[in-house]
Amino acid sequence: ASAVKYYSRWMEGKYCDPAKNQYRQHPLDYIEGLEATVKDALAQCPDGTAPNVVGIAFDTTGSTPVLTDKNGTPLALLPEYAENPNAMFVLWKDHTAIREAAEINELAKRWGIDYTAYEGGIYSSEWVWAKMAHVLRIDDSVCKEAYAWIEHCDWLPALITGKTKPEEVYRSRCAAGHKAMWSEKWGGLPTEEFLTSLEPKLAGFRSHLFEKTYTSDVKVGTLTPEWAERLGLTTGVAVSVGAFDCHMGAVGAEITPR
């Protein structure tokens, strides 16, 4: 069975401005889409299928990050930010952070460590640090509440397992390594000094984020009672670490190391 749900706000063209290369998505679009598609798919299955569903996994297009509060709640889910595009997910194809990406590249080339070494040697305006630096730089209002950021592929597993606090989220190695300049070689994310040299408003973010990352064969947890009820599934359903769609396509195609 398969199901499709068009994002209602996206279909209305909300929060996007093609003239500025701005493409934002409200987190409610994702929540509503998840509920609708799972229920629709189950409705197409024989009776008794739901108790036999044992796992859920997510792949998303990235980098699609969002600023969160201390509880890991995307800022757009708070009443005061509900209509602020800078408090929403910054879609992968949003290119409002071209300037910040250029600054990251210039900074990385003169830093002691080239944090773009495993990013293809050049950082993109489509990626998380450029986007978060841009949003914080242009919008003082979101700075008051912003505590951390999270990728779309990490937020959905965290949401439905009840593990949303930034320090306890299982972060995708796929997303962190490719977009956030994370590497075991230099101890995780770029240093606080590097990040604040890029944008002083990034101060403190690194300590609220992560050192460890996980691959998608790792279990984040199981559905919370609330989400089991919302999806029509059981609390025994396992949820895996998320990843990016293009990378998971390679897995599906059975691409293996040489």
For the regions a protein language model found, what residue spans apply to each?
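Short beta-strand scaffold segments in enzyme catalytic cores
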Residues: A1, T64-T68, K179-A180, M248-G252
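N-terminal glycine/serine-rich phosphate-binding loop of ATP-dependent small-molecule kinases
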Residues: A1-L77, G204-S207, E229, L233-A238
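Short beta-strand-loop/turn "lid" adjacent to the catalytic site in phosphate-handling enzymes
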Residues: N21, A43-V90, Y118-E126, P157, ...
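Short, hydrophobic/amphipathic alpha-helical packing segments
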Residues: I31-L42, W129-M132, C153, F244-M248
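Short glycine-aspartate micro-motif
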Residues: N52-D59, V90, W149, G236-A243, ...
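Gly/Ser/Thr-rich active-site cleft segment
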Residues: T68, H95, N105-F244
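Short alpha-helix plus adjacent loop in nuclease-associated cores
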Residues: N86-N105
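Conserved phosphate/anionic-ligand binding catalytic regions in large, soluble enzymes, centered on
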Residues: C174, V241-R258
